[in-house]
């Protein structure tokens, strides 16, 4: 897992969902562990798109349900544009 991307994702998640830093771990589920509802998730995806200057289509965003999956997906997008 790309540590730099994880740290940036972690910061966005903490800011967007207002959760404690120690709860943002790769296996944390946005809905179950971080109590994000569907609106929170949409706003989180938008914030991640802005932070990383990428676009995440809705069908891909629906599959991103944990912090680790977000990091993995963003890593692939960032590497593809590098």
UniProtKB/Swiss-Prot annotation:
It is found in: Cytoplasm. It comes from Gloeothece citriformis (strain PCC 7424) (Cyanothece sp. (strain PCC 7424)). 4'-phosphopantetheine is transferred from CoA to a specific serine of apo-ACP by AcpS. This modification is essential for activity because fatty acids are bound in thioester linkage to the sulfhydryl of the prosthetic group. Pathway: Lipid metabolism; fatty acid biosynthesis. This is Acyl carrier protein. The keyword Chloroplast does not apply. One of its GO terms (cellular component) is cytosol. Keywords: Cytoplasm, Fatty acid biosynthesis, Fatty acid metabolism, Lipid biosynthesis, Lipid metabolism, Phosphopantetheine, Phosphoprotein.
